[in-house]
Amino acid sequence: MNALTAVQNNAVDSGQDYSGFTLIPSAQSPRLLELTFTEQTTNRFLEQVAEWPVQALEYKSFLRFRVGKILDDLCANQLQPLLLKTLLNRAEGALLINAVGIDDVAQADEMVKLATAVAHLIGRSNFDAMSGQYYARFVVKNVDNSDSYLRQPHRVMELHNDGTYVEEITDYVLMMKIDEQNMQGGNSLLLHLDDWEHLGLFFRHPLARRPMRFAAPPSKNVSKDVFHPVFDVDQQGRPVMRYIDQFVQPKDFEEGVWLSELSDAIETSKGILSVPVPVGKFLLINNLFWLHGRDRFTPHPDLRRELMRQRGYFAYATHHYQTHQ
């Protein structure tokens, strides 16, 4: 933790009763909350959205908000304000979400529907150029020949923000576990900016606000480079980041050395959380002040993990990046 932002009291009220779900602090950190939909809520939600296959959500974007409203109504309209309060709260900003009874790859479509409902209670998920949809599903196997670290199992995927190489604002990231076979390791890694002991050193550096070039590999289906600084501030002047080590392209020696030192300082932080995410659960984080990554897996010839992601913007927030939109 550093002196830039003190941790506030956790918003979880032990005496608060919610309708349709429970909420507790996680074992890893009071910043990360665990939200669990009850079995009754889960079953009623799936019954009420059964008429719409995932393809309908892909083709008719307004249905994504419709399923969100159904879920919120089942939770006595307590869910949407709770999600927004948590994700916009600098002291928290992260949720591990679970629905009782959704825990098998055979329910993959139900997982997409649930995650879509939650995401569209806080904003809208952006078009994902890698998949051509508002979400992306991808598989990690024991052998990988792709052009980024996304699917490479036997190394750490370094901490980063999403949306660094696109022009759309990326306020939130949702990462869901759809399937897992012959897996050991591979926990999600999270770092809250205010728990990074070197934040002040790098945030105050002259290069922190210099626009840098970000370019994605061919698999991302994005051909246009974007330019923005690694650091920015929110409306209250607090540090936020748009950073990924794989895609930032330093233009000279000075930038290259600084970025290398930045990467080392992030990866060696004592504030990193290691979070197991079982099948059917998903992480939902504020992408402006949480970095995320993945630990390495233990090799196995039949290793398989399938993930689903959504990333988008908050429809109810006014504090995006202040100087570089």
From Swiss-Prot:
SUPFAM superfamilies: Clavaminate synthase-like (SSF51197). One of its GO terms (molecular function) is ferrous iron binding. Its EC number is 1.14.11.64. The keyword GTP-binding does not apply. Fe cation binds at H160, D162, H292. Its cofactor is Fe(2+). Keywords: Dioxygenase, Iron, Metal-binding, Oxidoreductase. Pathway: Amino-acid degradation. It catalyses: glutarate + 2-oxoglutarate + O2 = (S)-2-hydroxyglutarate + succinate + CO2. GO terms for biological process: L-lysine catabolic process. Binds 1 Fe(2+) ion per subunit. The keyword Oxidoreductase applies. InterPro entries: GlaH, TauD-like_sf. NCBIfam families: PRK02963.1. Homotetramer. This is Glutarate 2-hydroxylase. It comes from Escherichia coli O6:K15:H31 (strain 536 / UPEC). The gene is glaH.
